[in-house]
Structures are given as structure tokens and as C-alpha cells.
A protein has these predicted regions:
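ATP/NTP phosphate-donor binding region
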Residues: 1-76, 117-132, 143-151, 156-158
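Redox-cofactor binding/interface segments in oxidoreductases and associated redox assembly factors
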Residues: 10, 79, 197
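Short glycine-rich anion-binding loops that position phosphate/pyrophosphate groups of nucleotides
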Residues: 15, 83-85, 108, 201-203
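Short glycine/serine/threonine-rich phosphate/pyrophosphate-binding segments
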Residues: 19, 84-90, 204-209
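N-terminal glycine-rich phosphate/adenylate-binding segment common to multiple enzyme folds
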Residues: 71-76, 80, 85-88
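Gly/Ser-rich helix-loop-strand patches that form or flank binding pockets
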Residues: 88, 92-106, 110
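Catalytic core of DAGKc-family lipid kinases
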Residues: 107-193
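Gly/Ser/Thr-rich active-site loops/lids in small-molecule metabolic enzymes
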Residues: 185-232
Length: 232
């Protein structure tokens, strides 16, 4: 990793009030490596940890901003939590090309695999330019709706997906029937409880629980995984 990190944003799991100690450790590591780095803490994370704007942690001043403001002003997002926390933040900062680093505070971490006890070594190495950037695929999800065949479709939902997108039967008791197209070419009709479209990262999440394939993170691929399909 050759990009110089000048601004770091810290994001925590919502409503987690036990993050001050680890945030303090991060500040100490950063101060030891490069005290000129500007440190930011996401607003709700700061509130839960009783951190005030312009206060000092170690010898570094704290800046507090919302996620929306931070994504366009930081180089690195340090996320404290499990995979769910990382997924939520990654989706919000992806459009700005921010590097994401996960420190596991949950029970299981496929993407937040950095141990809090190894911060001095691992975070320090990254800040010295010795880190390796691992790129992960994402895709855009759009939901179009029209009242009849002649009416123009309206775009009612649009969002990036880091893990997966799921079309499901919801609360209805019967199966759904889905016509699947790839690049406007018909593939097949699936009858069942739903369909998961997942990235390589998402292949170890919901898709894995319904016997989907595990895809290597470096592959540029999407998996289509039926949920409880009606098939012989």
C-alpha cells in the first residue's frame, strides 16, 4: 500500500458504549507513527463513547463528523464491530473510494479479522505503507416498478450491495416465481422462497446457509443461489 494516510475516521457499532478504550489505543498507535495524521470519530460513535469535539485523546485532537461528511474527507475508515457493522459503513463510503479496515468487536469476523490486541503491529504497519490492499467486488441494486406493460418503469430503489441482494417471498405463504435474465437474456424461471445474488464476499454469508458456493474474493463473479427451490 503506497497511498499516504492523512486522515482517519473511526466508526463503531451503533449504541456500543464500550469503545473508548479501543479508540484510545488507536489514537496512541497513530500518534507514535505519525502525529500529523488528522483523527475523526463518527458522530454517534463519539456520543456513545462520551467523546467531545476538539478534546484530546493521547496528544491528538478529536474531530467529530457525520458519516456523510466523513466519507468525502478521510483516507481510511477504521471500523470497530463485527461483519454487520463493516458492511453498513462500507456501503456508505464505497462511492468515495475510502480504504476500509475492520477491527473485530463481534463474535465472528470474515471481513473484520484484525485483532484489537495486535493494533500496534498491524495498524502501525499499514500507516507505514506496509499494508496490502484487498479489493472486494460490489454491485448496484435497482428496483423498478410499473403498473402495466405499456407504462414506463419507475426507479423506486437504488443502492450498492457489498454482500448480497435477496428477492424473497416475504410474509406470503406460497412460493414466488422469478424469471431470471442476465444482460437481457433469459436464463430460467425459479420457483421457491426466493433468490440470493451475492458477491464473493457475500458467498460466506446468507448464501452459504442455503448451500451456495464459496467464491474466492479475487474472482470477479456473482452467484445466483435459490432459496428452497421447487426442483427435482
Amino acid at each position: 500500500m503506497t497511498t499516504k494516510i492523512n486522515k482517519i475516521g473511526i466508526f463503531g457499532k451503533p449504541n456500543n458504549k464500550n469503545l473508548y478504550e479501543i479508540i484510545e489505543k488507536i489514537f496512541i498507535v497513530v500518534e507514535n507513527i505519525d502525529p500529523k495524521i488528522h483523527m475523526f470519530v463518527e458522530k454517534s460513535t463519539a456520543e456513545c463513547s462520551s467523546i467531545k469535539s476538539k478534546m484530546f485523546i493521547s496528544k491528538l485532537s478529536v474531530n467529530i463528523e457525520t458519516v456523510e461528511n466523513l466519507k468525502n474527507s478521510i483516507d481510511l475508515a477504521v471500523i470497530l464491530g463485527g461483519d454487520g457493522t463493516l458492511l453498513g459503513i462500507a456501503r456508505q463510503v464505497a462511492s468515495a473510494g475510502v480504504y476500509v479496515l475492520g477491527i473485530n468487536q463481534g463474535k465472528l469476523g470474515f471481513t473484520t479479522d484484525l485483532d484489537v490486541n495486535d493494533l500496534q503491529h498491524n495498524l502501525g504497519s499499514l500507516l507505514r505503507g506496509e499494508g496490502i490492499v484487498e479489493k472486494r467486488s460490489m454491485f448496484d441494486v435497482r428496483v423498478l416498478r410499473k403498473k402495466n406493460k405499456t407504462e414506463e418503469a419507475l426507479d423506486i430503489f437504488n443502492a450498492p450491495a457489498f454482500n448480497d441482494a435477496v428477492v424473497s417471498r416475504g410474509a406470503i405463504s406460497h412460493m414466488v416465481e422469478l424469471d431470471v435474465f442476465i444482460d437481457n437474456s433469459y436464463l430460467q424461471t425459479i420457483r421457491g422462497d426466493g433468490l440470493i445474488v451475492c458477491t464473493p464476499t457475500g458467498s460466506t454469508a446468507y448464501a452459504l446457509s442455503v448451500n451456495g458456493p464459496i467464491i474466492h474474493p479475487n474472482l470477479e463473479a456473482l452467484a445466483l443461489v435459490p432459496v428452497a427451490p421447487q426442483a427435482l
